Amino acid sequence: MAVVPLLLLGGLWSAVGASSLGVVTCGSVVKLLNTRHNVRLHSHDVRYGSGSGQQSVTGVTSVDDSNSYWRIRGKSATVCERGTPIKCGQPIRLTHVNTGRNLHSHHFTSPLSGNQEVSAFGEEGEGDYLDDWTVLCNGPYWVRDGEVRFKHSSTEVLLSVTGEQYGRPISGQKEVHGMAQPSQNNYWKAMEGIFMKPSELLKAEAHHAEL
């Protein structure tokens, strides 16, 4: 699915000049930066040659690669209404826009570091419960200028990059994997993308807090 047509939808706020509330919301399409290694979460129709054999997930330095867009959705078997703010501690799915597969993990070993494999799984946005990740952050909501961690809801590893680099056919891309221990390697930040306008509920809460 191409990213450009999303710009034609109503109720969107771009990354620049958006809401002063600055929250990340369901339905937003974003790139996620690993702040330690300065790479964006990425996938493509290239499968692992070991482990699960599923679609690989990597980190890339390119800012412009369209294969780094992910749609934020509710956890498996739930609907998260467009514009609903993501709460700290909330389970979500991240669906790769161009291939329709979800960020996924399981008890396979990653090919380079020997940590837990992270892959992209499913068809047209539908996979299984191993696609669920819990957003770890400070405060009530995931805010766009803040760093977050993603904890795999089933195996409890943290989405991480530690710098291992692939050769051909994806030369220069970094391994993305799951790690049990928190560290600077598992912080992420929302960067470029299309951010859905926060729901009226959050605006009402913010107005009430100001009174």
UniProtKB/Swiss-Prot annotation:
Keyword Repeat set for record: yes
Record SUPFAM superfamilies: MIR domain (SSF82109)
Record's keyword annotation contains Secreted: yes
All copies of domain MIR, residue ranges: 21-75, 83-138, 139-193
Main location group: secreted
Domain of life of the organism encoding this protein: Eukaryota
Molecular function via GO: misfolded protein binding
Entry GO CC: endoplasmic reticulum; protein folding chaperone complex
InterPro entries per record: MIR_dom_sf (IPR036300), MIR_motif (IPR016093)
Subcellular location: Secreted
CDD domains: beta-trefoil_MIR_SDF2_meta (cd23293)
Keywords: Repeat, Secreted, Signal
Transmembrane domains' residue ranges: none
Pfam hit, one: MIR
GO biological process: chaperone cofactor-dependent protein refolding
Signal peptide: 1-18
Protein name in UniProt: Stromal cell-derived factor 2
Source organism of this protein record: Homo sapiens
Gene name per UniProt: SDF2
